[in-house]
Amino acid sequence: VQTYFFRRKNINAAGNARSWTDHLLWHHAAHTVDLFAYQCGEDISECYGVQGPIHPQLGIAMDMGIVCKVPSGSILTLSLSFNNDGPLGSFFRYICDNGTYKAFYDDLSDGKDNKIDVSKVDVSMDGIELEDREFIAAIKEKREPNASLAELLPCMHVLGKLESIVDPQRKAHA
């Protein structure tokens, strides 16, 4: 998976200043590491990571590489960078045994740039609406919602282990 942005200032996608600093590991890698474990249906058994230098003003690493493995043998190789000099926004490339997929916001294409229609995948293209629908349904059905805090904890443990590898002194949080 490639997760690439261009970031030199502490601003959001709309160009507005943030009161917090974005982070490759604790924000962007979290999405992919969690998705990988979810899709595999297994907890991550091995992980390793490296990061580049800490940006002097932002106080975060601008580049990172992560490898994870589950007991059945599937692996995740994740490359993250805030040094991608491209349009505002992000793109994601997913490579698997079922093909190559590129996502940019709500657009999805295959590895040859053929658009994939995702408009009929769910009742809405709005991710926030879908999260809200799932949460309300879980309350009505008296069940744990998909993507609950409990389901996220294994991912947080993996990220903690990765942080201890790439930033053992927690310099990026000083």
Question: Language-model segments: what does each one mean?
Answer:
Residues 22-23, 119-122, 143-145:
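Active-site rim elements
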Residues 1-50, 54-56:
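Predominantly a Rossmann-like dinucleotide-binding segment in NAD(P)-dependent oxidoreductases
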Residues 1, 41-45, 75, 99, ...:
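Generic structural signal for secondary-structure transition and capping sites
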Residues 28-31, 130-131, 150, 154:
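A generic structural signal for residues located within well-ordered alpha-helices
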Residues 66-68:
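Short beta-strand scaffold segments in enzyme catalytic cores
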Residues 71, 135-174:
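C-terminal helix-rich "cap/oligomerization" subdomain common to oxidoreductases
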Residues 32-33, 129-136, 159:
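A general structural signal for well-ordered alpha-helical segments in protein cores
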